[in-house]
């Protein structure tokens, strides 16, 4: 029960930390759950642990354009001079400058340059240059980025459109239906989570049979229900069908268009695009995954990806190294049960090497909040002696001074215990998980007290 309770919390953290910093995936989940879609099991979508790649807006818009979806004209600029040239090329009286950062709330964010807002309307190429100079190369701080902020390396310069009406459209995966679902609303251009909470009847859902695919009739019905005028219903439906094809082609887990609009010329346009891609499809979506912007990722997240480790940083002070996502979540829950707070989720997987274990310790100890470490391994496919070798090597090479509690069970566990005992290192072995969790929590409290008193503390193994 405790593990399942933590599961939902972990997914929320994963979404914010490692994947889409924007709120699109969560928003779609809340929209689905808001009215009990599919026999009141809509909230299950929030408990799907997925690793998602996120791309910058301009990259997503390029994919839409390639798919034949109608979007405003726009180009990416990596310098103020390029922004000036693009604004001049577009030739319109006013253009929009959009900061390209993987974080939600950019419109209300603040740059370290002092500029307020990551989306600006400008009225001349000169102003485009001036505004972009305050964005490019500067960090943008939003509610999602916190104090760290996110660096803005480029801006999207696009023509300004004057919408008559704004709509919301998204495609996401719904676990309880075991397939994709289209989501639409006449309330576009606003926070869709608020719409789902305040006016759930304004949200329309259309499940799609994954084998049959989307039917033109379904898209037409959805466009009509969303309130598109009769003269552009066909155009709206065509864009929806093309977006669904894009969704399947690139193994997306979510496409969100907010807003989809009818502009002053009567054309249907997708004004913004947020797309998440399933990281499990990386082997067959090389074109997409080569676009990942590592400058937008936390350093530890980058190191974890290089070592092929599943790592998510949290706010606690007890580092965790575990094999298997389920056991990792149960380990964090039992730490919480005994009054501690986990500093991370770290799953080394079922085939970890000595090198990966060492890299895992580097990740954990690079977090200065960590005051104690709990290793919890159940050796099935994983051999406990391999883990033990990695632990011994890491403690030696990294000169780890904080307490390390190790609980090993399973394949070659006796060999593993012998390796740890023969190492002469101050590694605390424990067979019982409950006892190990209680021990690591107490040790973290001791280290906390020592730090508060500005004294050192040394640990000796029990006789």
UniProtKB/Swiss-Prot annotation:
<dbReference type="GO" id="GO:0005759">
    <property type="term" value="C:mitochondrial matrix"/>
</dbReference>
<keyword id="KW-0225">Disease variant</keyword>
<feature type="modified residue" description="Phosphoserine">
    <location>
        <position position="279"/>
    </location>
</feature>
<comment type="similarity">
    <text>Belongs to the succinate/malate CoA ligase beta subunit family. ATP-specific subunit beta subfamily.</text>
</comment>
<feature type="site" description="Important for substrate specificity">
    <location>
        <position position="94"/>
    </location>
</feature>
<comment type="pathway">
    <text>Carbohydrate metabolism; tricarboxylic acid cycle; succinate from succinyl-CoA (ligase route): step 1/1.</text>
</comment>
<dbReference type="GO" id="GO:0009361">
    <property type="term" value="C:succinate-CoA ligase complex (ADP-forming)"/>
</dbReference>
<feature type="modified residue" description="N6-acetyllysine">
    <location>
        <position position="139"/>
    </location>
</feature>
<dbReference type="InterPro" id="IPR005809">
    <property type="entry name" value="Succ_CoA_ligase-like_bsu"/>
</dbReference>
<feature type="site" description="Important for substrate specificity">
    <location>
        <position position="162"/>
    </location>
</feature>
<feature type="modified residue" description="N6-acetyllysine">
    <location>
        <position position="368"/>
    </location>
</feature>
<keyword id="KW-0816">Tricarboxylic acid cycle</keyword>
<dbReference type="InterPro" id="IPR013815">
    <property type="entry name" value="ATP_grasp_subdomain_1"/>
</dbReference>
<protein>
    <recommendedName>
        <fullName>Succinate--CoA ligase [ADP-forming] subunit beta, mitochondrial</fullName>
        <ecNumber>6.2.1.5</ecNumber>
    </recommendedName>
</protein>
<dbReference type="GO" id="GO:0006781">
    <property type="term" value="P:succinyl-CoA pathway"/>
</dbReference>
<feature type="binding site">
    <location>
        <begin position="105"/>
        <end position="107"/>
    </location>
    <ligand>
        <name>ATP</name>
    </ligand>
</feature>
<dbReference type="GO" id="GO:0006105">
    <property type="term" value="P:succinate metabolic process"/>
</dbReference>
<dbReference type="GO" id="GO:1901289">
    <property type="term" value="P:succinyl-CoA catabolic process"/>
</dbReference>
<feature type="binding site">
    <location>
        <position position="258"/>
    </location>
    <ligand>
        <name>Mg(2+)</name>
    </ligand>
</feature>
<dbReference type="GO" id="GO:0004775">
    <property type="term" value="F:succinate-CoA ligase (ADP-forming) activity"/>
</dbReference>
<dbReference type="InterPro" id="IPR016102">
    <property type="entry name" value="Succinyl-CoA_synth-like"/>
</dbReference>
<feature type="modified residue" description="N6-acetyllysine; alternate">
    <location>
        <position position="88"/>
    </location>
</feature>
<keyword id="KW-0460">Magnesium</keyword>
<keyword id="KW-0597">Phosphoprotein</keyword>
<keyword id="KW-0547">Nucleotide-binding</keyword>
<feature type="transit peptide" description="Mitochondrion">
    <location>
        <begin position="1"/>
        <end position="52"/>
    </location>
</feature>
<feature type="modified residue" description="N6-acetyllysine">
    <location>
        <position position="78"/>
    </location>
</feature>
<keyword id="KW-0809">Transit peptide</keyword>
<dbReference type="GO" id="GO:0006099">
    <property type="term" value="P:tricarboxylic acid cycle"/>
</dbReference>
<dbReference type="InterPro" id="IPR011761">
    <property type="entry name" value="ATP-grasp"/>
</dbReference>
<keyword id="KW-1274">Primary mitochondrial disease</keyword>
<feature type="binding site">
    <location>
        <position position="98"/>
    </location>
    <ligand>
        <name>ATP</name>
    </ligand>
</feature>
<dbReference type="GO" id="GO:0006104">
    <property type="term" value="P:succinyl-CoA metabolic process"/>
</dbReference>
<dbReference type="InterPro" id="IPR013650">
    <property type="entry name" value="ATP-grasp_succ-CoA_synth-type"/>
</dbReference>
<feature type="domain" description="ATP-grasp">
    <location>
        <begin position="61"/>
        <end position="288"/>
    </location>
</feature>
<feature type="modified residue" description="N6-acetyllysine">
    <location>
        <position position="129"/>
    </location>
</feature>
<feature type="modified residue" description="N6-acetyllysine">
    <location>
        <position position="143"/>
    </location>
</feature>
<feature type="binding site">
    <location>
        <position position="323"/>
    </location>
    <ligand>
        <name>substrate</name>
    </ligand>
</feature>
<feature type="modified residue" description="N6-acetyllysine">
    <location>
        <position position="216"/>
    </location>
</feature>
<keyword id="KW-0496">Mitochondrion</keyword>
<dbReference type="GO" id="GO:0070062">
    <property type="term" value="C:extracellular exosome"/>
</dbReference>
<dbReference type="Pfam" id="PF08442">
    <property type="entry name" value="ATP-grasp_2"/>
</dbReference>
């Amino acid at each position: 029960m405790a593990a399942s309770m933590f599961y939902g919390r972990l997914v929320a953290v994963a979404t914010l930390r490692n994947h889409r910093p924007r709120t699109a995936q969560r928003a779609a989940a809340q929209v689905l759950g808001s009215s009990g879609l599919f026999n009141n099991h809509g909230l299950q979508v929030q408990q799907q642990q997925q690793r998602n790649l996120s791309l910058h807006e301009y990259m997503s818009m390029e994919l839409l354009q390639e798919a034949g979806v109608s979007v405003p004209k726009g180009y990416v600029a990596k310098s103020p001079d390029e922004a000036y040239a693009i604004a001049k090329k577009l030739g319109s009286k006013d253009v929009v400058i959009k900061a390209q950062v993987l974080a939600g709330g950019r419109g209300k964010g603040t740059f370290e340059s002092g500029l307020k807002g990551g989306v600006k309307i400008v009225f001349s190429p000169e102003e485009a240059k001036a505004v972009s100079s305050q964005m490019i190369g500067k960090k943008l701080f939003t509610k999602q980025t916190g104090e760290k902020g996110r660096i803005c390396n480029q801006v999207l310069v696009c023509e300004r459109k004057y919408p008559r009406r704004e709509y919301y459209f998204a495609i996401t995966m719904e676990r309880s239906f075991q397939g994709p679902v289209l989501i639409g609303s006449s309330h576009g251009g606003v926070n869709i989570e608020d719409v789902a909470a305040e006016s759930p009847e304004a949200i329309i859902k259309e499940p799609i049979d994954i084998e049959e695919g989307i039917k033109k009739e379904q898209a037409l019905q959805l466009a009509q229900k969303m309130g598109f005028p009769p003269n552009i219903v066909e155009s709206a439906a065509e864009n929806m069908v093309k977006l669904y094809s894009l969704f399947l082609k690139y193994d997306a887990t979510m496409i969100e268009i907010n807003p989809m609009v009818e502009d002053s010329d009567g054309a249907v346009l997708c004004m913004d695009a947020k797309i998440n891609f399933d990281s499990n499809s990386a082997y067959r979506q090389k074109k997409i995954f080569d676009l990942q912007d590592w400058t937008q990722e936390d350093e530890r997240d980058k190191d974890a990806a290089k070592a092929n480790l599943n790592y998510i940083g949290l706010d606690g002070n007890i580092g965790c190294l575990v094999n298997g996502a389920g056991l990792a979540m149960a380990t964090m829950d039992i730490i919480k049960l005994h009054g501690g707070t986990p500093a991370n989720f770290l799953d080394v997987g079922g085939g970890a090497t000595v090198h990966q274990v060492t890299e895992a310790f580097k990740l954990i100890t690079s977090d200065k909040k960590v005051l104690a470490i709990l290793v919890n391994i159940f050796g099935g496919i994983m051999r406990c002696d391999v883990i033990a070798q990695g632990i011994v090597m890491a403690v030696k090479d990294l000169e780890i001074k904080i307490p390390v509690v190790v609980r090993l069970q399973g394949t070659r566990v006796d060999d593993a215990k012998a390796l740890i005992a023969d190492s002469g290192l101050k590694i605390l072995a424990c067979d019982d998980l409950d006892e190990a969790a209680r021990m690591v929590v107490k040790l973290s409290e001791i280290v906390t007290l020592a730090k508060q008193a500005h004294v050192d503390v040394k640990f000796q193994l029990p006789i």
